[in-house]
A protein has these predicted regions:
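Walker A/P-loop NTP-binding motif
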Residues: 304-322, 340
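Walker A/P-loop
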Residues: 289-312
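Accessory nucleic-acid engagement/destabilization modules that flank
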Residues: 1-259
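Inter-Walker segment of RecA-like/P-loop motor cores
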Residues: 348-359
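Conserved pre-motif I regulatory segment
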Residues: 260-297
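Conserved Walker A/P-loop ATP-binding site and its immediately adjacent core
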Residues: 322-346
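Catalytic cores of nucleotide-enabled group-transfer and carboxylate-activating enzymes in metabolic
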Residues: 253, 257-262, 309, 342, ...
Length: 359
C-alpha cells in the first residue's frame, strides 16, 4: 500500500524488510479486501476459462454450471480469508496478544453457542437458497474456510478473538467484506439457479479449486501488493487474466492451433507411420462426452506411450480434457518419458501456442 499499516487496517499479507519477519519492520502490506478480490477473480477465471467448470458440474450430475453458479462459487471464494478479521490474526503484525491463524477461528465458530451471531455480518443467511439445506451450506463454507489443503475439524471457540477493540472491530470487517462481495458478484445474490446438492465430491473439488486459486492469487509475480483500495476487483480480474494466460491454464489457443489431422505421424515425427496393432486399437476407442476410462495393457515396446498421446490429442481437440498427466514409478522412467512427450508436443503445436511439459 502507499501508506504505512495501522492497527485499524485489515491486512491479508505482509512484506518484511529483507523478507525476514524477525526484523519486525513491515515495508509493505496487502489489504484483506484486495486479496479477497484476487482469489475470487482467479476462481472466476478458472471456472470460465478451463474445463474445471464442466468437472464440477459432472460431480453433481449436471450438464453445466450456470453463470449464477459461477458467481456464487466466486463469491464464496472471496470469503475464504474472512477469519483474517479476527484480533488474533491482525495482532500478528503488531506483536500483540492473543495471536492466532485465520482458519481455525473461522471454523471454530461452528462450536459457538450462536454461530450465526458471528457469521451473520458475512450475509450468510442470504446464502441459504444457494444450497439444498443449511447442512450443505455449512459443509460448503467449511470447504471455503479450510482452504489450505487439509480438512479442519471445528474445535473450541474463542470469543475473545472476535471482540472489538479501540483499534478494530472484526464484525465491521466482515460487514465491509460482505458489502464488496455483493458489488463484485451481484448475480450470485440476485440471480436464480438450482441449489447445490449434498455432494461431498463436489465440496471436495471446490476446496481444491479454491486452494489452487489461493496459490495463484497469492503469487506476487501476478498479484503485486495493491497501492490503493480503489477498484480492487477491476485490478484483480486484470491480473487473473494475465495469470491464467501465463500459466497456460486456458488451452483454447493451443487447441485452435492443433492441426485437424494430427496423429501418429506428428507424434512420432515419421511421415506415413503404420501404427502398431495396439495403437490402432486405441485410436479407434470411442470418445464419450461424459467421460470414460480406457485401460491399455501391452508388451514393452509395443507403442503404448504414443497410443496414449494419440488418445490425448483426440480428447484435447474435442475439448474433453485440458491436459495430460503421466504417473510412472521411477525418476529414470519419468525423465525418458518427459523427453519423448516434449518432442511430440514440439511436433504437434506451433511454438507460440505450445503447452508446457513439466516433470
Amino acid at each position: 500500500m502507499d501508506r504505512p499499516l495501522t492497527p485499524s487496517d485489515f491486512w491479508a499479507k505482509l512484506k518484511y524488510k529483507d523478507d525476514d519477519r524477525s526484523t519486525g519492520e513491515i515495508v509493505d502490506w496487502h489489504p484483506l479486501l484486495a486479496h479477497s478480490a484476487d482469489v475470487a477473480a482467479v476462481t472466476e477465471a478458472l471456472l470460465t476459462r478451463t474445463i474445471l467448470r464442466d468437472r464440477l458440474a459432472s460431480l453433481i450430475g449436471w450438464d453445466d454450471l450456470s453463470d449464477v453458479h459461477v458467481a456464487r462459487l466466486s463469491a464464496l471464494a472471496a470469503l475464504h480469508d474472512a477469519g483474517k478479521v479476527t484480533q488474533g490474526f491482525q495482532n500478528r503484525a503488531f506483536g500483540r496478544t492473543p495471536e492466532s491463524d485465520h482458519v481455525t477461528p473461522m471454523v471454530n465458530v461452528y462450536h459457538a453457542s450462536d454461530p450465526l451471531a458471528y457469521l451473520a455480518p458475512l450475509g450468510i443467511t442470504d446464502l441459504k437458497d444457494w444450497t439444498a439445506d443449511l447442512d450443505v451450506l455449512g459443509h460448503l463454507l467449511l470447504a471455503t474456510f479450510g482452504h489450505h489443503g487439509t480438512p479442519v475439524t471445528p474445535g473450541a471457540h474463542d470469543p475473545m478473538l472476535w471482540e472489538d477493540s479501540d483499534d478494530r472491530d472484526p464484525e465491521a470487517g466482515l460487514t465491509r467484506l460482505d458489502t464488496h462481495v455483493r458489488e463484485w458478484f451481484p448475480a450470485a445474490y440476485d440471480g436464480t439457479a438450482p441449489a447445490f446438492p449434498a455432494t461431498p465430491a463436489f465440496q471436495h473439488a471446490f476446496n481444491g479449486l479454491l486452494t489452487l486459486a489461493d496459490w495463484i492469487g497469492s503469487d506476487t509475480s501476478f498479484f503485486p501488493f495493491a497501492d490503493t483500495l480503489d477498484a480492487p476487483m477491476e485490478r484483480a480480474r486484470s491480473h487473473a487474466a494475465e495469470a491464467v494466460d501465463a500459466l497456460f491454464l486456458d488451452p483454447d489457443a493451443s487447441r485452435a492451433a492443433l492441426s485437424a489431422d494430427s496423429g501418429f505421424d506428428q507424434i512420432l515425427g515419421q511421415p506415413d507411420w503404420d501404427p502398431y496393432p495396439i495403437q490402432e486399437a486405441v485410436r479407434d476407442v470411442p470418445l464419450h462426452d461424459n467421460g470414460g476410462l480406457a485401460v491399455l495393457e501391452s508388451d514393452t515396446g509395443s507403442g503404448k506411450t504414443e497410443a496414449a498421446l494419440a488418445r490425448y490429442v483426440r480428447l484435447f481437440r474435442k475439448g474433453l480434457v485440458d491436459g495430460l498427466y503421466f504417473a510412472v514409478p521411477t525418476r529414470t522412467a519419468a525423465t525418458q518419458l518427459h523427453d519423448r512427450v516434449t518432442a511430440a508436443v514440439k511436433r504437434l503445436f506451433p511454438e507460440d501456442q505450445r503447452p508446457p511439459v513439466v516433470q
